[in-house]
Amino acid sequence: MPAYKRVLLKLSGEALMGDDAFGINRSTIEAMVNDIAEIVKLGVQVAVVIGGGNIFRGVAGGAAGMDRATADYMGMLATMMNALALQDAMRHANIEGRVQSALRMDQVVEPYIRPRAIRQLEEGKVVIFAAGTGNPFFTTDTAAALRGSEIGAEVVLKATKVDGVYTADPKKDPSATRYTTISFDEAISRNLQVMDATAFALCRDQKLPIRVFSIVKPGALKRIILGEDEGTLVHV
């Protein structure tokens, strides 16, 4: 019996690279889609917000000297490429994925329309939200918090390459330990980089919990949906 009826899955663009240095690793994206298919079969309504850092990041070195708003719009276009790749992989897995974009690109994808997105979720389709919030200076983490709040998701599932939130960077500090649960306020006071501050504040204000987990850990997503202890739960 699923613990959640409707979830917002946040996928980072970097996670799509797999072991590659850039771009989209096909086997990695197929593995992600298989994980999503597992929970769709359980009757869970799934929406996805996808990043673009595997292609372009508005705040990264490649954007040095560039107008920040222009760089952010380029990052939004990168998320569109990832969203189309994810939708295509879903089609091969017999899942109907619908891409809705915060920036209009009508020949390619639908515009973001909240009632339509909710209806598609209720029909069992996976809705992929592209182009972040459609505004520069806002991250795709903030888009995940915003869209999760708008569609009435019960939890934001933040898929990363580490299996939760740690007391310190586990790659740099071998003594770092993982939190199983932590409050928003404690995470803020300890300056734990779960999400950027805007996304974090929005989730806290909307009482929308965040579960941080490893997308590369086999079966992790399904275990979360079944209510098992996986990753770190950030709560009010």
From Swiss-Prot:
**Protein name per the record:** Uridylate kinase
Catalytic reaction list: UMP + ATP = UDP + ADP
Gene Ontology terms: cellular component: cytosol
One MF term from GO for this chain?
UMP kinase activity
The family assignment reads:
Belongs to the UMP kinase family.
The residues listed in the UniProt record as binding UMP, with positions renumbered to this chain, are G52, D72, T133, G134, N135, P136, F137, F138, T139, T140
User: What disulfide bonds does the UniProt entry report for this chain?
Assistant: none
